[in-house]
Amino acid sequence: MISSFAKRVAISIISASTIGLVNPAQAASAKMNATPVNETKFAVVAAPIRGSGRSQLQIYEQVSSERACFSKNGTSVDPLLVSFDFTNICRRYIDSNGYSVRIGDRDYTATYSLNIRRNGNELLLVATPSRPDVGPELEVARANGNGDGFVSLTLNAGW
């Protein structure tokens, strides 16, 4: 099953990876294309930032079947790729060079950033505006349960 979110994540990831290969002027004008992806090959994760009590967004992609890149058990994710050289086996996207906020055909990289925030006992992935006049904060995904360590995030409908 291919979800709308997985399509957008993959597009943003692929586009960001490709854009890094061209000059900044070309990158600024590049348009991202929609390409279907298999969402089971991706894990959207709230990864702990050591010693801070906070988490950051990481996205893992299974590129080949040579070795598993991650394992999910409920809301927990085991990032298996950290235990081996994952070149040509997995991809890991850990910052805005690897993902962005898109709504429709518009890229909001310059105006929204993706952040993990705790709301009570739950972790949320939110798109936070850089300025008040840009728009509201948007909830993109949630953990759907309490978790510590590496926590799987489920995208909200439409993402």
Per-segment meaning from a language model:
Residues 26-82, 118, 145-159:
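Extracellular/luminal recognition modules and glycoprotein regions
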